[in-house]
Amino acid sequence: MKALAKLERGPGLTLTRVKRPEVGHNDVLIKIHRTAICGTDIHIWKWDDWAQKTIPVPMHVGHEYVGEIVEMGQEVRGFAIGDRVSGEGHITCGFCRNCRAGRRHLCRNTVGVGVNREGAFAEYLAIPAFNAFKIPPEISDDLASIFDPFGNATHTALSFNLVGEDVLITGAGPIGVMAAAIAKHVGARNVVITDINDYRLELARKMGATRAVNVSRESLRDVMADLHMTEGFDVGLEMSGVPSAFTSMLEAMNHGGKIALLGIPPAQTAIDWNQVIFKGLEIKGIYGREMFETWYKMVAMLQSGLDLSPIITHRFAADDYEKGFAAMLSGESGKVILDWTV
């Protein structure tokens, strides 16, 4: 089958032919319709330090996808040939304390599709049936293909009650922009998102952010004054991994505020712990999606009117993957979709 793989230890990916995956007794085989390019895939493309330490070579990658089930293992129940599915990209052990307690998103033995094992940038993908998630007919293939990052945004944004709250989001990448849309959808009062990328800040405006602030030109304090915010933000969603962004968030939080961290800052990043301790801030780290509560919430929000369509800005045939990665690398894109059916 056709697949997009890391064949050599260096930058780039190669469209190649690989063996169609075997289907275990508890697996489903998915014929891929669409995939989306993730920031993780950009790290793999660039072959940065993280990728060099993490990605097996050779291996085909990718973990954001939608497709249809074409084969099932003999032990699989609850699915049928032809079901349209996306899937949870974190494959968990099922036996550790967290898994057995129903906290699979905290499994210490997690294996990532397209990171630690063969991925979805291919014509077919085999995964455990447990990880497959049926997609309702009213949700398009394009939207279903971005359920993985949509899930990151959902898990982060819905970590705390947002109704009537003032929310600060630092980082207007696709996940941050989707988090802004989610926050407004569920009833936040003011949703302010910061970045230095005007293209993505404009996407955030289209998705419903109250204010999209280029912090290289505009003061967050001035924006807060314009919005008549006198006590600080109630909830912070840190999506950038940029130390200065986290510092500005800590300074802007109200006492008793709550922060969810999805962005990954450099190791040994220093912060002013006085801001955390004397403000009584609550800080929560976010990894992946809750299985499968996050997935049900994603579907419910789309069915109740959440519009994520503006975040999908580019579409290419899988054979034109280089154009897709160029769009992502340019910084002037939202989500980029690759079509494996043409």
Curated annotation (Swiss-Prot):
Binding site for Zn(2+) 2: C93, C96, C99, C107
Catalytic activity reported: L-threonine + NAD(+) = (2S)-2-amino-3-oxobutanoate + NADH + H(+)
Cell compartment(s), UniProt: Cytoplasm
Record protein name field: L-threonine 3-dehydrogenase
Lineage: Bacteria, Pseudomonadati, Pseudomonadota, Betaproteobacteria, Burkholderiales
Keyword line: Cytoplasm, Metal-binding, NAD, Oxidoreductase, Zinc
Gene that this polypeptide is encoded by: tdh
Site (described: Important for catalytic activity for the proton relay mechanism but does not participate directly in the coordination of zinc atom): D148
Active site per database record: T40 (charge relay system), H43 (charge relay system)
UniProt entry tagged with the keyword NAD: yes
The EC number(s) this enzyme carries: 1.1.1.103
Gene Ontology BP annotations: L-threonine catabolic process to glycine
Free-text function comment from the UniProt entry: Catalyzes the NAD(+)-dependent oxidation of L-threonine to 2-amino-3-ketobutyrate.
Cofactor-binding details, from the entry: Binds 2 Zn(2+) ions per subunit.
Pfam families in alphabetical order: ADH_N, ADH_zinc_N
This protein's GO CC annotations: cytoplasm
Positions with a binding annotation for Zn(2+) 1: C38, H63, E64
Cofactor entry: Zn(2+)
